[in-house]
Amino acid sequence: MIAIIETGGKQILVKEGETIFIEKIEGAEGSKVTFDKVLLLDNKIGKPYVESAKVIGEIQKQGKAKKIVVYRHNAKSTHKRKLGHRQPYTRVKITGIVG
């Protein structure tokens, strides 16, 4: 069974037993999380969401992604700017798709 869920401003295709990386959500490691915004469930298409469908998962890890460096330089001047950013994420294992 497959589903497309909406979380963190993104749409993610999920299957039962799969591990996904999503934008950070609150919750401790090992706790259950429910996604109610299901856009597609097998052959049912929601308008905008499928009624009474939900995806259940378990939070495995809260972490930060690899650091990216943003460097800005203005030509013909001494202005330089270097910034780093690490995006927080949550790793979730999909345990069930109900609908």
From Swiss-Prot:
<dbReference type="GO" id="GO:1990904">
    <property type="term" value="C:ribonucleoprotein complex"/>
</dbReference>
<dbReference type="Pfam" id="PF00829">
    <property type="entry name" value="Ribosomal_L21p"/>
</dbReference>
<comment type="similarity">
    <text>Belongs to the bacterial ribosomal protein bL21 family.</text>
</comment>
<keyword id="KW-0694">RNA-binding</keyword>
<dbReference type="GO" id="GO:0005840">
    <property type="term" value="C:ribosome"/>
</dbReference>
<dbReference type="InterPro" id="IPR001787">
    <property type="entry name" value="Ribosomal_bL21"/>
</dbReference>
<protein>
    <recommendedName>
        <fullName>Large ribosomal subunit protein bL21</fullName>
    </recommendedName>
</protein>
<dbReference type="GO" id="GO:0003735">
    <property type="term" value="F:structural constituent of ribosome"/>
</dbReference>
<dbReference type="InterPro" id="IPR028909">
    <property type="entry name" value="bL21-like"/>
</dbReference>
<dbReference type="GO" id="GO:0006412">
    <property type="term" value="P:translation"/>
</dbReference>
<dbReference type="InterPro" id="IPR036164">
    <property type="entry name" value="bL21-like_sf"/>
</dbReference>
<comment type="subunit">
    <text>Part of the 50S ribosomal subunit. Contacts protein L20.</text>
</comment>
<keyword id="KW-0687">Ribonucleoprotein</keyword>
<dbReference type="GO" id="GO:0005737">
    <property type="term" value="C:cytoplasm"/>
</dbReference>
<dbReference type="GO" id="GO:0019843">
    <property type="term" value="F:rRNA binding"/>
</dbReference>
<comment type="function">
    <text>This protein binds to 23S rRNA in the presence of protein L20.</text>
</comment>
<keyword id="KW-0699">rRNA-binding</keyword>
<keyword id="KW-0689">Ribosomal protein</keyword>
